[in-house]
A protein has these predicted regions:
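Coiled-coil dimerization/phosphotransfer module
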Residues: 1-126
Length: 126
């Protein structure tokens, strides 16, 4: 979690994106396998990279919380967005989807042209 916060701060500040970071404090009390930690970090990193490369956003909200028996990661921006119906996923999004599948998680991408993008990962906890 600390690495994710540091990466977010560095990435957002370097690219002059205003951001809000909402991470639950209870992450110290949950157990996630090392492999799933790695997947989670790399999904987060790829989502930030995509935001910087394609979104042209000014603001972002990055949150990670525990709800019931699920870890929910959400990355939301106010960028240019895209039409998800006519979008052909590149390697980055395909890799994120593959990692989510390996975690037995669900990755949702919601985007509207001119209104930004929200990426949400729902990961079941043991």
């Amino acid at each position: 979690v600390l690495r994710m916060k540091e990466l977010a701060a560095e990435t957002m500040e370097l690219n002059k994106i205003n951001y809000q970071l909402n991470f639950d404090q209870q992450f110290n009390n949950i157990s996630i396998t090392m492999q799933n930690r790695r997947h989670l970090f790399l999904i987060f990193k790829e989502a930030l990279n995509n935001m910087v490369k394609y979104a042209s956003c000014k603001n972002a909200v990055l949150s990670m919380q525990i709800k019931g028996h699920n870890l929910i990661l959400e990355i939301k921006d106010d960028g240019v967005g895209f039409d998800t119906k006519n979008f052909i996923a590149g390697n980055g999004l395909a890799n994120m989807q593959q990692r989510a599948t390996e975690m037995k998680a669900t990755l949702l991408v919601h985007s509207t042209p001119g209104k930004g993008t929200t990426i949400t990962l729902h990961c079941p906890l043991k």
